[in-house]
């Protein structure tokens, strides 16, 4: 068949399409949080509408929650208003909510998969850019704006133009201490922050097939950072084993029936991709960003680009601006540059697999005296599992702060922020100017490299 995985899901959810209007597709799962939903609820009230299908809508608190306390009253003024508003809205419209008192609360793109809400073949939307995370399950998942949130509330549908198809096949032998975060940063460096614009990117190849679901989620999470609408991976036995016995997986069919259905969710051998890349990752070293967008990446033992070597004027100007903001110089190495904070968390790297990697690095060691380091699990269940395994003790003995679940320092929307000019080694997904706090300097990397940075208090290359 010539139909891609993306096209199969789009077509199976198509409600209406003609030459003169934007196609309308059905939405299987609508995830919401406290930041982008209030205005949408207000719009419903103004128009005297109800949420069309509350059982296909699910809410959590994550973006601006305190990670020190589970009390709403301990958060900032606006955060308190938003969380209390979410509670009221969910009660008024009969939407299930994981609030701060619930062990299942967490980052929306962590709890959806771990609860089994996200299933192969689904359409999933959320008022958040990194909804593409759910594409790791063979779902069509993408972020939407607040007006679209209201539209989905009211109709359980969305107007959505068809995207083009891009495939990125990843192959090679993964070297020691190379993780999915390194792979996706390397790809974004090659493709650029706008290379995926107008596309849904299907990730495939021998490396993807061997990845855990946690690693696949990291890959799809950052597809948006290359400008793509979404990232997607065909489901397989690894997907099915992850989902088996999850809370929200419907029980109205046998497991074999689900697998038989999901096995059809794949691109055919003759599927057409407008762009088709093959990337060998055998050679890559741990990756780190040096600038203010996720494509400004070098190996940890590499050097920042030299300005005169950059032919494109716009790219050269962006590079100059990024270097000035980051307090760095062209042609230099990041090695031995001191760091102020280390943040391990976010919807990119806050799952149990990530925390186990960090624990393996820092066990029986101490972080550097100049470092403030925090580890923020992606959900209450991740926190519970980590504590069951004794990882929290390893972290605290090493000098890390062990927090409650939330988005935390990924974005400057809660108490966890950088001070001006502080430099942070972060496992999050965006290194934009001010992303982690006004004038804060963010370097993106894997949990493994972030843990090493915490131990040494500076950027290091461990061969």
UniProtKB/Swiss-Prot annotation:
Pathway, per record: Amino-acid biosynthesis; L-leucine biosynthesis; L-leucine from 3-methyl-2-oxobutanoate: step 2/4
UniProt KW keywords: 4Fe-4S, Amino-acid biosynthesis, Branched-chain amino acid biosynthesis, Iron, Iron-sulfur, Leucine biosynthesis, Lyase, Metal-binding, Plasmid
Pfam families, sorted: Aconitase
A GO BP entry: L-leucine biosynthetic process
Coiled coil: none
Gene3D superfamilies assigned: Aconitase, domain 3
Keyword Lyase: yes
The EC number(s) this enzyme carries: 4.2.1.33
InterPro entries: 3-IsopropMal_deHydase_lsu, Acnase/IPM_dHydase_lsu_aba_1/3, Acoase/IPM_deHydtase_lsu_aba, Aconitase_4Fe-4S_BS, Aconitase_4Fe-4S_dom, IPM_dehydratase_rel_enz, IPMI_cat
Cofactor: how and how many bound: Binds 1 [4Fe-4S] cluster per subunit.
Residues that, per the record, bind [4Fe-4S] cluster: 347, 407, 410
GO MF annotations in UniProt: 3-isopropylmalate dehydratase activity; 4 iron, 4 sulfur cluster binding; metal ion binding
Record's catalysed reaction(s): (2R,3S)-3-isopropylmalate = (2S)-2-isopropylmalate
Superkingdom classification of source: Bacteria
Cofactor list: [4Fe-4S] cluster
Known function: Catalyzes the isomerization between 2-isopropylmalate and 3-isopropylmalate, via the formation of 2-isopropylmaleate.
Family: Belongs to the aconitase/IPM isomerase family. LeuC type 1 subfamily.
NCBIfam families on file: leuC (TIGR00170), PRK05478.1 (NF004016), PRK12466.1 (NF009116)
Name recorded for this polypeptide: 3-isopropylmalate dehydratase large subunit
Species this protein is from: Buchnera aphidicola subsp. Cinara cedri (strain Cc)
Gene giving rise to this polypeptide: leuC
């Amino acid at each position: 068949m010539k139909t891609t995985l993306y096209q199969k899901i789009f077509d199976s959810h198509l409600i209406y399409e003609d030459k003169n209007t934007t196609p309308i597709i059905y939405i299987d799962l609508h995830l919401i949080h406290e930041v982008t939903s209030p205005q949408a609820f207000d719009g419903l009230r103004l128009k005297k509408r109800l949420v069309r299908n509350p059982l296909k809508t699910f809410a959590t608190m994550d973006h601006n929650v305190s990670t020190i306390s589970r009390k709403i009253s301990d958060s900032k003024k606006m955060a308190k208003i938003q969380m209390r508003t979410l509670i009221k809205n969910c009660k008024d419209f009969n939407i299930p909510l994981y609030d701060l008192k619930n062990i299942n609360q967490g980052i929306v793109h962590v709890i959806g998969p771990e609860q089994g809400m996200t299933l192969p073949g689904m359409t999933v939307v959320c008022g958040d850019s990194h909804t593409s995370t759910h594409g790791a399950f063979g779902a069509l998942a993408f972020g939407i704006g607040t007006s679209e949130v209201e539209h989905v509330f009211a109709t359980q549908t969305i107007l959505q133009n068809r995207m083009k198809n891009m495939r990125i096949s990843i192959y090679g032998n993964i070297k020691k201490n190379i993780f999915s975060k390194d792979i996706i940063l390397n790809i974004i460096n090659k493709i650029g922050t706008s290379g995926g614009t107008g596309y849904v990117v299907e990730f495939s190849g021998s490396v993807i097939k061997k990845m855990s679901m946690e690693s696949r989620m990291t890959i799809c999470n950052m597809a948006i950072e290359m400008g793509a609408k979404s990232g997607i991976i065909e489901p397989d036995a690894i997907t099915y084993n992850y989902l088996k016995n999850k809370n929200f997986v419907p029980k109205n069919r046998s497991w074999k029936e689900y697998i038989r259905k999901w096995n059809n969710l794949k691109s055919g051998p003759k599927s057409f991709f407008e762009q088709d890349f093959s990337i060998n990752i055998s050679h890559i070293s741990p990756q780190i960003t040096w600038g203010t967008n996720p494509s400004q990446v070098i190996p940890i033992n590499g050097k920042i680009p030299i300005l005169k070597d950059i032919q494109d004027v716009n790219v050269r100007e962006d590079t100059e601006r990024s270097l000035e903001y980051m307090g760095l110089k062209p042609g230099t190495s990041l090695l031995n540059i001191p760091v102020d904070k280390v943040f391990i968390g976010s919807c990119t790297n806050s799952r149990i697999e990530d925390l186990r990697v960090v624990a393996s690095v820092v066990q029986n060691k101490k972080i550097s005296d100049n470092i403030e380091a925090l580890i923020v699990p992606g959900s209450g269940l991740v926190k519970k599992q980590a504590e069951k395994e004794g990882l929290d003790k390893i972290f605290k003995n090493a000098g890390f702060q062990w927090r409650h679940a939330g988005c935390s320092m990924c974005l400057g929307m809660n108490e966890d922020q950088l001070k001006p000019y502080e430099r942070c080694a972060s496992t999050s997904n965006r290194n934009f100017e001010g992303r982690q706090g006004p004038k804060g300097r963010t370097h993106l990397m894997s949990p493994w490299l972030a843990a090493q940075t915490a131990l040494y208090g500076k950027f290091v290359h461990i061969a």
